[in-house]
Every structure is written in structure tokens, then in C-alpha cells.
Amino acid sequence: MLLIAGLGNPGPTYAKNRHNIGFMAVDEIARRWGFPAARSRFRSLAAEGAIDTPQGPVRTLILKPQTYYNESGRAVGEAMKFFKLQPSDVVVFYDEIDLAPGRFRMKTGGGAAGNNGIRSVASQIGPDFRRARLGTGHPGQKELVHGHVLSDFHKAEMKWVEPLLEACADAAPLLALGDDEKYQAEVMRLAPAEKADPRKLAQGKPRGE
């Protein structure tokens, strides 16, 4: 079984925030692969279904923790324990300010790099889970990060957000088979984005963008 969790904050106030792109990604995966409506379970909105692969369907649980972003690990830990899963069975989708907008990277293990949601998951299940990092860009200065991640995507940004989410869903069979390297490559093939230093990109923007 595969457990796919998205990080985000619950409720309509936060729904379009950059911090909620993890929720957006798992919603698109659930929609693309015909998962049933989510229900309250494991301190989350949870939906169980399957992702079709060349080797057959892979049973998958999609989680949107309702604990608020920084406590997401409690939900992931409960579900993992219930299904007796290993960290390698868990994929967490989340926003990554240290990647340029639209960039996508898979990673297994490592530190939290200042992300409190990832730190929470690691505190519950250990660090060796799989991370799907969705680049949202950096505002350029540390003191601007909080406002940046808790602000909605601008309309212009949806030109890369929507293709990225669709690519994450369309390529999901590779994720379900555990081939994270090919999954990353296929997502970036379907939704290419320029590789750049997100802080330098921020410096080139007019104020207020």
C-alpha cells in the first residue's frame, strides 16, 4: 500500500495559499485516478483508492491532515501505524521555497530544511520517507517568508501551478511503483520549468508581486 499525504492548512481561508500546494497536488491525484470522496479519518480528510500501473493497480491512501501544517506528522503517523507501513511507503507532497516556481524534486530522507511540517512528520515516523517538493519560490528575504507562504497564488502563477499539479497526477503510476527518479523526470517533462535560484528571481521582481 502507498500512503500519499499532502501538507497544508485546513479550511477555505488557506485553500489557495502557496503553503497548500501539497493539498492541491493530492487533490489532483485523487481526481485523476477516480478516488471516492474523502472522509474524516486519521485526523485527516482521507480517501482510499488505487493508481493503475503497468504492473496492476496499487492500493493508495491519500491524506490531507486537518491538524494544521506544523502538526501534520500526527495524522501521517496514525495512518502509517494503522496500515503497518514502512517510511518507504509514504510520500509527502509539500511546498518548497528553495526551489524556483514550478520546479519539482523528489527526495528520500534528510533533514527538514526549516519546514515545520516535514519536521513534524519526521518526528512521528523517522526521516526516511519520500518527499515530493513543489517549488513555490522564495520572497528574497527571511522575514518575508511567513507572509509569502500564507498568501494566495497570484493569477499569473496559475499558468505554472495548474500544469504542475496535472503532471504530478498524470505521472503517478511511476510514483506508485516506487520509481521516484523517473517520476521526477516525467513530471518535469510534462510541466517544464526554468531552473533558477529562487532568491535571485525574487530580487528581480517589482515590489508587491
Curated annotation (Swiss-Prot):
<keyword id="KW-0963">Cytoplasm</keyword>
<feature type="binding site">
    <location>
        <position position="70"/>
    </location>
    <ligand>
        <name>tRNA</name>
    </ligand>
</feature>
<dbReference type="GO" id="GO:0004045">
    <property type="term" value="F:peptidyl-tRNA hydrolase activity"/>
</dbReference>
<dbReference type="GO" id="GO:0006515">
    <property type="term" value="P:protein quality control for misfolded or incompletely synthesized proteins"/>
</dbReference>
<dbReference type="GO" id="GO:0005737">
    <property type="term" value="C:cytoplasm"/>
</dbReference>
<feature type="active site" description="Proton acceptor">
    <location>
        <position position="19"/>
    </location>
</feature>
<feature type="site" description="Stabilizes the basic form of H active site to accept a proton">
    <location>
        <position position="95"/>
    </location>
</feature>
<dbReference type="GO" id="GO:0000049">
    <property type="term" value="F:tRNA binding"/>
</dbReference>
<dbReference type="InterPro" id="IPR036416">
    <property type="entry name" value="Pept_tRNA_hydro_sf"/>
</dbReference>
<protein>
    <recommendedName>
        <fullName>Peptidyl-tRNA hydrolase</fullName>
        <ecNumber>3.1.1.29</ecNumber>
    </recommendedName>
</protein>
<keyword id="KW-0820">tRNA-binding</keyword>
<dbReference type="GO" id="GO:0072344">
    <property type="term" value="P:rescue of stalled ribosome"/>
</dbReference>
<dbReference type="Pfam" id="PF01195">
    <property type="entry name" value="Pept_tRNA_hydro"/>
</dbReference>
<feature type="binding site">
    <location>
        <position position="14"/>
    </location>
    <ligand>
        <name>tRNA</name>
    </ligand>
</feature>
<feature type="binding site">
    <location>
        <position position="116"/>
    </location>
    <ligand>
        <name>tRNA</name>
    </ligand>
</feature>
<dbReference type="InterPro" id="IPR018171">
    <property type="entry name" value="Pept_tRNA_hydro_CS"/>
</dbReference>
<keyword id="KW-0694">RNA-binding</keyword>
<feature type="site" description="Discriminates between blocked and unblocked aminoacyl-tRNA">
    <location>
        <position position="9"/>
    </location>
</feature>
<feature type="binding site">
    <location>
        <position position="68"/>
    </location>
    <ligand>
        <name>tRNA</name>
    </ligand>
</feature>
<comment type="subunit">
    <text>Monomer.</text>
</comment>
<comment type="function">
    <text>Hydrolyzes ribosome-free peptidyl-tRNAs (with 1 or more amino acids incorporated), which drop off the ribosome during protein synthesis, or as a result of ribosome stalling.</text>
</comment>
<keyword id="KW-0378">Hydrolase</keyword>
<dbReference type="InterPro" id="IPR001328">
    <property type="entry name" value="Pept_tRNA_hydro"/>
</dbReference>
<comment type="similarity">
    <text>Belongs to the PTH family.</text>
</comment>
<comment type="function">
    <text>Catalyzes the release of premature peptidyl moieties from peptidyl-tRNA molecules trapped in stalled 50S ribosomal subunits, and thus maintains levels of free tRNAs and 50S ribosomes.</text>
</comment>
